[in-house]
Each structure stands twice: as C-alpha cells, then as structure tokens.
C-alpha cells in the first residue's frame, strides 16, 4: 500500500518517539501516508524527558498542556463536580434495566441560536469506562422540513470539569464556541446530535468514555425517530478524540449503526507522548492539563488517584476548578507546570495506570474504524500531527480509506475552521453514496 508521506521539508523536525516503553505502547508497522498538504511547514517541539513524572498525563484542546503525576499512592476521594440541579439529568434507580441507547426521558427546549430548528434533549442509558450503567445526555437539533434526513453526531471540544459547562447547556447559553458550525450542518438539511460526551461526572480526558456516550447518543436519537437516514461523526480536538473513539469502538460496541463516515481534526492521539512533549516546563495552558488529570481521576478513582501526590497548592487548585469551565481553568494555572503542584520521585507508572493511558489513546487503542475517515491537522499544531498521521497509516493498513490533510501554517486554533468546511463536504459525499477518497 502506498504510504502517507510528509512533504520533504517537514521530515527533518519530526519529534523522535518517546523512549519510555510504557508510554509508547505497542508498535505497529504502518505505512506512511501521502498527505495532502497544501504546502510544507515544520513542527519543532522536541520531546522533554528530563522531567518525566511517575505519571500519565494528558494535554487536550487548544494547544494542550497536561503535566501531572499519578503515583502508587492509596486511592482517596476524587473531587467530583456539584450535582446537576436540573432533575431531568438524574439517572433513575433502575438505569441498569435499560439497554445502551434506550431513551429514559425526553423534552423539547427552545432552539435559540439555531433558526428554523427544533431542539430535543434526550436522557439515555450508556456505560462508563468500567462498563457500569450511567445516564447520559444528548441534544438533538432538527431543521425544518420533513422526511428522512442524515444525522451527524457532532462532538464539541469541552475543556471543563463543571457540569454547567456541558454542551446541553452551552448550546443555548453562548458557551459553545462551535454553534456556527452546527448551523452549517443544519443548513444542509441534516439533523445534529450533540452529546455531553464527558459524561455525568465531567470526566475530562476520558476519551473512551466519550466514544461510548457518542455511540449510545446516536442510538438514542435513532430510537427517538431519526432512524431512516445515514449517520456521520464529526469533531475537533477534544471532540475529535470522542469522535475517533466512537469510530474505533463502533465495529464491536455498536455495529448496527449505519455510520458512513467520520471526520476529525486536531486530535491528540497519545496522551502520554503529548505530555512528554509539552509538560516539562511552564505552559500557558497548563490548567487544561491539570483538569484532565482531575477528570481521569474521576473516571478511574481507584487507579488514577491524585491523593498523596499533590502539595497543598495542588489540593487547593483541584478544589478550586472542580466546577470550572475552560477560561477559568486556563486562568487558574497559566504558565505553571507539574512541579508547582505535585511531589514525588521519578518512579515508573504502574501497569494499571499504563493500561488506562493506552485505552484512552487512539495510537495504542487496537480498534480500527470500518468506515471512511477524514482527518486533518494544522501544520504548526502543538498537538503533534505526526502521531495522528501514524494512526491514519495504521487504519490504512487495516483497509480503512483515510483522507489525511495538513492545513499549512495553521496552529491548533486556526485549523478548525478550514478543516471543518472540508469535513462537512466530505460527510455530504458519504451521505450521497460517493466513493470515499483516500491518500493511503
């Protein structure tokens, strides 16, 4: 198979693979893809290894900067968000009696900001990372007109720990920065499902959870009345992580769904390697990294506990941002690093922690999408586009058509707009039944 190959001018600055066996995970012999860059740029962030913690860490959206230490300390009490005050979100005691994707309750809400659309919110049954039943939420926007229509599940980037920051709120209170993109989808006549993919504890960083919630949200929307059309997936950055995991999980977790394509951009595909790249020194977005550590602790409290590893400043910060949204999180720890908040030596992480890291990183998660994939990244993205290219190469080797594009000169924030235009056109072609392009 032909390889997805970087342009000649980009090869010299490719960061070397992290040498830590645990972080790297399994090695895949993958082809290198023939990228479709519209020009050459260089990515020059070199891996820092001198400050490798005894921990797994994650950087997420809008440049990413997670640097924190998970150690072998005894499990303590994770700090969870204040409960959602709206009783509509509450899981019924019998949630385990429902099947994944079953609608528990529904309601209409005003579709302010989405002209001509109607909006429904669906509480449905899903499963957390341990497989336990949970209640999750998706908001479904339906454009005017009748008949069968495609459904796009759009996963927003949500860099938050508070339940009030979830898409089901941000869609209508101005907090969701991707509302304009949703109107572009509605203008095409497509229904749009927007899941609260961080789950009922706002477990920021738990990407596999986001994939499950996304798929069960699609099931819920179809069982609610949108079962006649094809399905597409889309998302960027943290939303791209949930999108990528939904595509990779679907063949086993939800094989019955008629998903015809997935489009994802700016995706952090290996949370450990990204941490080694950006976590060893002060970073303006370090707060997002700290928040992701808190989110992983919420989803895996017995293994990813932060108790005993934080100094008093870390304990205070964890409590202060427990209900915060993106801007507050960024401001709370701007230009800090893990040494400001954590204590401990340079020991290796445990096998259980490595397992959790791998199951939340697309590079090391073995599942492969069975539908065509469009993937894009900015040429100057701090979220290393080379790792995403490697994942695309593995998908190519497994027979999945992948179109991988580099947006020349774009950093993480700038790549979303042009890539989304291409992504929506790509999904439109999949809905029309056209052959999927591929630069495998």
Tell what function each PLM region has.
Residues 76-147:
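Catalytic-loop region of hydrolases
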Residues 82, 86, 268-365:
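Accessory cap/linker subdomain of secreted extracellular hydrolases
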Residues 128-137, 141-184, 196:
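Short, surface-exposed "cap/lid" segments of acyl-processing enzymes
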Residues 204-225:
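Alpha/beta-hydrolase active-site loop
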Residues 219-286:
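Primarily recognizes the serine-hydrolase "nucleophile elbow" in alpha/beta-hydrolase
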Residues 374-378:
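Short beta-strand/loop motif that positions the catalytic acidic residue
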Residues 381, 403-415:
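Histidine-bearing beta->alpha loop at or near hydrolase active sites
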Residues 382-388:
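Conserved alpha/beta-hydrolase "acid-adjacent" motif
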